[in-house]
UniProtKB/Swiss-Prot annotation:
It comes from Arabidopsis thaliana. Residues 1-16 are cytoplasmic. Residues 38-603 are lumenal. Coiled coil: none annotated. GO terms for molecular function: methyltransferase activity. This is Probable methyltransferase PMT20.
């Protein structure tokens, strides 16, 4: 009996082990099967996101018609007057929560969902519709940007001058006492590429009131002005009120929201950025976003130190040391001194890979070459890296001098389009043709488009910048926004000679209230509604839209009723229009924001 019971135990144990083994193998196989499905579907989603703008909007008879989503009517209250310049992700009231190291408190710090405001931001008392372009470049209404501090503190530098109910912009600046046009003339003498269409895109760090960027527009150069939110100067708000491209931002601990090799030129006119501190990490970010062959221009300390040091409250020895340190850092990053005259110095980012190969071979080199695990285009809440981003070997024609000159480059498929899933020269050509037809139709349903009533425009979810390209002859500029969650097509936008930024529409955009005349979106809610609540996107749109400004929403019919209901609660007046192909599955909603004043103010 004992021997029989003992002999039966191994048999049961073996059976149980075999059963578990079979189950485990089956589970693994099923997991691989599900993983294959997931990866396949994920690729389809990415492909759909890119190719949605490269195919005609023709309804498929096989697609089931979903019942449009419905929501209850809602009426959003007014925010208090203290919110009139509210920037949710760069809110001075939240600065004390964050560290002062490298001024990181000035970076984006967005409130959690439970702290988001669900109210409408009022304009300042006495707000008027902005002066139209191009007069707006020279003057704006004081009540629209009521900042006296900058007028008083910078009066001797002629940044701006208050006269009656207007601010006037005489084109002065810290480093251009003879006017910005004279300053840019000197710069063009040093950089002939600014005259022939070679240089098209630029970034101005620490932009003042954006007079440099404003002057470049007449020279065929599109500059994006960059400055942090502050309590006094409101540099970006002044720039956008003037109709000059600008965005809130600071080089601190995170990368700027642009891809690598984006700008043809970067500029700093006494922008007070400590370029040689922290191992030159700020210069490394400039190196990342400037394309090979592009330029970095510096005017102000320590340039021309032997003549200027007395006015800088320093010693000539200190400034000489700073200059030598700056030159050494730039050389170690594969910049070469290009030209210098008086207060302006120019360095050029090398295109020759031998410099980067030399860094890679020298194990003791500082800064080192970034390894392959660091994605050069990753730029949404991505920490700054203390290393040199070398040009990608497979991309050989993205450098300045290799890409076509402006305006030819707008319609030539850049080499980096091959990095976008489904991207090709044919897809870009098709996209351009499609957007020409769409914009032609938009101008029928919104006659103000193409006139001086609209200056600052945002394409909230572009792919190749086709909407912007179709408007290139009109008196507007376009901020092209590429979702941080979609395929990385922003390098293509920059290679075409346009400007833009990465962004996640679950968060607030990096700008002041009342800064855009037109917001355009194409299928944004279809693509993002699973992540972002619709009402918060629309409230953010209302925040950045100017009173009397317009919205063009091109969206699936499934969302149209809900969008219309929310828009009514935001005090927009809207009308529904057919698309250019009059398909049932897609509609256009054209809205206008009303000019209203807080009940606590007088109009």
């Amino acid at each position: 009996m004992k021997s029989g019971k003992q002999s039966s135990q191994p048999e049961k144990g073996t059976s149980r082990i075999l059963s578990l083994t079979v189950l485990f193998i089956a589970f693994c196989g099923f997991s691989f099967y599900l993983g294959g499905i997931f990866c396949s579907e994920r690729d389809k989603i990415v492909a759909k996101d890119v190719t949605r703008t490269t195919t005609k909007a023709v309804a498929s008879p096989k697609e089931p018609t979903a019942t449009p989503i419905q929501i209850k009517s809602v009426s959003f209250p007014e925010c208090g007057s203290e919110f009139q310049d509210y920037t949710p992700c760069t809110d001075p009231k939240r600065w004390k929560k964050y560290g002062v190291h490298r001024l990181s408190f000035l970076e984006r710090h967005c409130p959690p969902v439970y702290e988001k405001n669900e109210c409408l931001i009022p304009p300042p008392d006495g707000y008027k519709p902005p002066i139209r372009w191009p007069k707006s470049r020279e003057q704006c209404w004081y009540r629209n940007v009521p900042y006296d501090w900058i007028n008083k503190q910078k009066s001797n530098q002629h940044w701006l001058k208050k006269e009656g109910d207007k601010f006037h912009f005489p084109g002065g600046g810290t480093m251009f006492p003879r006017g910005v046009s004279h300053y840019v003339d000197l710069m063009q003498d040093l950089i002939p590429e600014m005259k022939d269409g070679t240089v098209r895109t630029a970034i101005d760090t620490g932009c003042g009131v954006a007079s440099w960027g404003g002057d470049l527009l007449d020279r065929g150069i599109l500059s994006l002005s960059l400055a942090p939110r502050d309590n006094h100067e409101a540099q970006v708000q002044f720039a956008l009120e003037r109709g000059i491209p600008a965005i809130l931002g600071i080089i601190s601990t995170q990368r700027l929201p642009f891809p690598s090799n984006a700008f043809d030129m970067a500029h700093c006119s006494r922008c007070l950025i400590p370029w040689t501190e922290f191992g030159g990490i700020y210069l490394l970010e400039i190196h990342r976003i400037v394309r090979p062959g592009g330029f970095w221009v510096l005017s102000g300390p320590p340039v021309n130190y032997n003549r200027r040091w007395r006015g800088w409250n320093t010693t000539m020895e200190d400034q000489k040391s700073d200059y030598n340190k700056l030159q050494s850092l730039l050389t170690s990053m594969c910049f070469k001194k290009y030209a210098q005259k008086d207060d302006i110095a120019v360095w050029q980012k090398l295109s020759d890979k031998s410099c980067y190969d030399k860094i890679a071979k020298n194990m003791e080199a500082y800064p080192p070459k970034c390894d392959d695990s660091i994605e050069p285009d990753s730029a949404w809440y991505t920490p700054l890296r203390p290393c040199v981003v070398a040009p990608t070997p497979k991309v050989k024609k993205s450098g300045l001098g290799s890409i076509p000159k402006w305006p030819e480059r707008l319609h030539v498929a850049p080499e980096r389009i091959g990095d976008v899933h489904g991207g090709s020269a044919n897809s870009l050509k098709h996209d351009d043709g499609k957007w020409k037809n769409r914009v032609k139709h938009y101008k029928k349903v919104l006659p103000a488009l193409g006139t001086d009533k609209i200056r600052n425009v945002m394409d909230m979810n572009t792919v190749y910048g086709g909407f912007s390209a179709a408007l290139i002859e009109d008196p507007i500029w376009v901020m092209n926004v590429v979702s941080s969650y979609s395929a990385n097509s922003l390098p293509v936008v920059f290679d075409r000679g346009l400007i833009g930024t990465y962004h996640d529409w679950c968060e607030a955009f990096s700008t002041y209230p009342r800064t855009y005349d037109l917001l355009h979106l194409d299928s944004l809610f279809t693509l993002e509604s699973h992540r972002c609540e619709m009402k918060y996107i629309l409230l953010e749109m209302d925040r950045i839209l100017r009173p009397s400004g317009y919205v063009i929403i091109r969206e699936s019919s499934y969302f149209m009723d809900a969008i219309t209901t929310l828009a009514k609660g935001i005090r927009w007046s809207c009308r529904r229009e057919e698309t250019e192909y009059a398909v049932k599955s897609e509609k256009i909603l054209v809205c206008q924001k009303k000019l209203w004043f807080s009940s606590n103010q007088t109009s």
